[in-house]
């Protein structure tokens, strides 16, 4: 069983990907202001690479942005690549 948890302290946050109870990936972000976040890092344990976990983390941030009516600046190269390839998420890109 997999799950993604979010932690946010209003200045920065993270989405953490768990497989069973083991942390296998993480995406971090910082708040620019009340309307924008910057995704600054995405990382997945190499043993779990190629399963799409990194993309799932970015898409979880997209869902969060839509619910909060905010925009995302994908500074992290991986997140930028996900945004560049997926036209369906451009609505939240700043």
Residue spans of the language-model regions?
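Active-site rim helix/loop that mediates acceptor-substrate recognition in acyltransferases
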Residues: 1-14
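Conserved beta-hairpin
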Residues: 14-24
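A conserved beta-strand-loop-helix scaffold within acyl/acetyltransferase catalytic domains
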Residues: 20, 27-36
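Conserved acetyl-CoA pyrophosphate-binding loop and the N-cap/start of the following alpha-helix
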Residues: 48, 52-57
């Amino acid at each position: 069983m997999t799950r993604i948890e979010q932690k946010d302290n209003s200045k920065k946050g993270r989405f953490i990907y768990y497989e069973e109870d083991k942390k296998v990936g993480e995406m971090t972000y910082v708040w620019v202001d009340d309307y924008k976040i910057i995704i600054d890092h995405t990382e997945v344990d190499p043993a779990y690479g190629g399963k799409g976990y990194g993309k799932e983390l970015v898409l979880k941030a997209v869902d969060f942005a839509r619910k909060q009516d905010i925009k995302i600046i994908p500074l992290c190269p991986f997140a930028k690549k996900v945004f560049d390839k997926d036209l369906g998420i451009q609505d939240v890109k700043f």
